[in-house]
């Protein structure tokens, strides 16, 4: 067995039968075929920034190290072809160094490019789907590559076809990004709303997003964590109207379909849970949406804490939080919401 601690940011004690770093598609196919012959479970990991290992993993963990960025352009757009092992934040920095705007709101989101479409990552009013042109996928059982258009990815809030139809036996090998040369800032959220739309540049937005995220979010090197642990819940307009009567200042984001998205961090904060600790796991002092490993947390500490947070928010607001983090059991991914219910 090999330790998974260096390969995931929650840094809980967990091991895998084998760990293989993948640098080429041929190698990936070879290792996959070998695991299939031995009936061994396989797990793909990028930066390990959005997973919690509940138990030791009984099979082989493949670490994505497929690197490389290609840049093309026409009169209207920049086109980036990014291999899936590239670090997402490094990609954002690289694009700005090439004077390409459009990714600055997504700065400092942990993980690699291949995870971006799976989660449809998003922050500060921009989601991956807004910049995605296509996603390249390898069907490991057939040994064939294919390309999905943006529409075929079926993106939703922290949601995509890669969590369903293409969850097993498929891997994202590259993403295609399409970024308009006629850059428009997105200043809807938080302190970005203070900028003058006609005067701001993408570097300023990048710097502000980084400053805010660094102030709020703990460094995984100091306290193990997986960023935002819970998704922001979406509720009906009727439910929201009732909550707003009792909590007039409740942060809310109306959705196109009439539903209303709430800020999970605010809901947790109202339950006075910042700093609340179970075993070695705690709700972070500065950002209630983040659960941290204080150094000696076990997976069960984190699950128990997540359960307590979920129950507390449900009791106060009748809103049930769902984890954004993926839970990995002995044989692969398990239902995270069930695990903390």
Curated annotation (Swiss-Prot):
PANTHER family: UDP-N-ACETYLENOLPYRUVOYLGLUCOSAMINE REDUCTASE. The active site is at residues 158, 228, 324. GO terms for biological process: cell division; cell wall organization; peptidoglycan biosynthetic process; regulation of cell shape. The gene is murB. Cell wall formation. Belongs to the MurB family. Pathway: Cell wall biogenesis; peptidoglycan biosynthesis. One of its GO terms (molecular function) is UDP-N-acetylmuramate dehydrogenase activity. Residues 12-182 form the FAD-binding PCMH-type domain. The keyword Transcription does not apply. This is UDP-N-acetylenolpyruvoylglucosamine reductase. It catalyses: UDP-N-acetyl-alpha-D-muramate + NADP(+) = UDP-N-acetyl-3-O-(1-carboxyvinyl)-alpha-D-glucosamine + NADPH + H(+).
């Amino acid at each position: 067995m090999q330790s998974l601690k260096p390969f995931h940011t929650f840094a809980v004690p967990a091991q895998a039968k084998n760990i293989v770093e993948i640098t080429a598609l041929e190698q990936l196919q070879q290792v996959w075929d070998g695991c299939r012959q031995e009936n061994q479970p396989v797990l793909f990991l990028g930066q390990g920034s959005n997973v919690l290992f509940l138990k030791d993993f009984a099979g082989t963990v493949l670490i994505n190290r497929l690197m490389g960025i290609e840049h093309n352009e026409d009169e209207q757009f920049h086109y980036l072809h990014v291999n899936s092992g590239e670090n997402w934040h490094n990609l954002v920095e690289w694009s700005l160094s090439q004077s390409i705007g459009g990714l600055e709101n997504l700065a400092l989101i942990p993980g690699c490019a291949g995870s971006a479409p799976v989660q449809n990552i998003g922050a500060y009013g921009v989601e991956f789907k807004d910049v995605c042109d296509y996603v390249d996928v390898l069907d490991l059982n057939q040994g064939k590559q294919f390309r999905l258009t943006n529409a075929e990815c079926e993106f939703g809030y922290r949601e995509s076809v890669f969590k369903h139809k293409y969850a097993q036996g498929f891997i994202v090998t590259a993403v295609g990004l399409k970024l308009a040369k006629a850059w428009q800032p997105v200043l809807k959220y938080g302190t970005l709303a203070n900028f003058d739309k006609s005067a701001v540049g993408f570097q300023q937005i990048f710097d502000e997003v980084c400053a805010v995220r660094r102030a709020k979010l703990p460094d995984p090197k100091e306290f193990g964590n997986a960023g935002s642990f819970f998704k922001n819940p979406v509720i009906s307009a009727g439910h929201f109207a009732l909550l707003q009567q009792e909590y007039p200042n409740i942060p809310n984001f109306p959705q196109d379909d009439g539903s209303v998205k709430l800020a999970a961090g605010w809901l947790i904060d109202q339950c006075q849970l910042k700093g609340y600790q179970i075993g070695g796991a705690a709700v972070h002092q500065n950002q209630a949406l983040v659960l941290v490993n204080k150094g000696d947390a076990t997976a069960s500490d984190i699950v128990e804490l997540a359960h307590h947070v979920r129950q507390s928010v449900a009791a106060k607001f009748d809103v049930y939080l769902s984890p954004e983090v993926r839970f990995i059991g002995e044989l692969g991914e398990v239902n995270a919401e069930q695990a903390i219910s």
